[in-house]
């Protein structure tokens, strides 16, 4: 079973992201309401993906991305940034910090589902016909 860490200071947004991703099937969701809580969870467990809000009250999304990329064990973790800051400058900044992908709020459920499917796909599997 794949594990996804959803990090957002809004419980409503955490629940909405999880609901959007339920069609993926066998996924276990864990939640963090702050950047610091996300770092603590990452230290204790392994995840296949992190969906991360950019703006949080303690440790921001960019700082969490930088922390993850500095850890050997976590370096390859795909990180999808989900934020209200959808401008090109914010996108470029988080991708340069090491985020894997970026999605601006508000988004359609199909948009986040497609992004997560792409990030969870094995390398080289995108566009391949199923065996």
List each language-model region with its residue ranges:
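C-terminal output helix
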Residues: 107-116
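His-Asp phosphorelay/catalytic-motif detector in bacterial-type signaling
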Residues: 46-48, 73-78
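Two-component/phosphorelay signaling modules centered on CheY-like receiver
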Residues: 11-30
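Receiver (REC) domain active-site loop signature in two-component systems and cognate sites
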Residues: 56
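Acidic, metal-coordinating helix/loop segments flanking the phosphotransfer/catalytic sites
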Residues: 31-49
């Amino acid at each position: 079973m794949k594990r996804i860490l959803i990090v957002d200071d809004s419980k409503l947004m955490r629940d909405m992201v999880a609901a959007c991703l339920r069609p993926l099937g066998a996924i276990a969701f864990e939640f963090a309401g702050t950047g610091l809580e996300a770092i603590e969870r990452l230290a204790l467990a392994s995840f296949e993906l992190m969906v991360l809000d950019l703006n949080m009250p303690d440790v921001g999304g960019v700082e969490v991305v930088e922390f993850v990329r500095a850890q050997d064990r976590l370096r390859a973790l795909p990180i999808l940034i989900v934020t209200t800051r959808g401008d090109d400058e914010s996108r470029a900044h988080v991708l340069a910090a090491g985020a894997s992908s970026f999605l601006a709020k508000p988004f359609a459920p199909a948009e986040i589902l497609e992004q997560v499917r792409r990030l969870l796909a094995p390398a080289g599997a995108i566009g391949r016909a199923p065996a």
